[in-house]
């Protein structure tokens, strides 16, 4: 456990962002609800600026509320959820931008918080674990990054001629192609399978992903 090792060495393990950690069942009471998720914070880290999880709002949400955003959701990732289904979502030339401005993104928020922490603690031992979510589903990014790359210039995805042929490559791939639905990663509401997405749709997702990287 790197956080506990840092504590032994005299450092405060400061967390900015999140850690996806499955807790050791030997260390928590039987039936603890934290055992049902891998989105826990690694024991030993001190949460300085937490972006939240599926079950918990984070410091970023409080920041957005203070900035006057009026559509703050109850979970970390729902901030990027679009109230659209997949059939209308892809009819636009570019996927919609995020609800928040570039300067208010979780990336910008964490960066500023980490800089302030380092400045405050520069004369004493310190350690910073700064973990950005982006680029990562859900695939949405703030203006102007959502229009930075046109999907028409994105290469076509490499696919087999049919889903059945694709599935023959590996049993796990067969499972994913049969069970992975859009909503698990892209927050669409129609329950369709990701494997059935058109090349054009996937290219628009890739174009948005490139914007997230930028």
Map each language-model feature to its residues:
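Active-site-proximal cap/lid insertion segments
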Residues: 54-55, 59-112, 116-214
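Catalytic-site neighborhoods of secreted/periplasmic enzymes
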Residues: 1-100
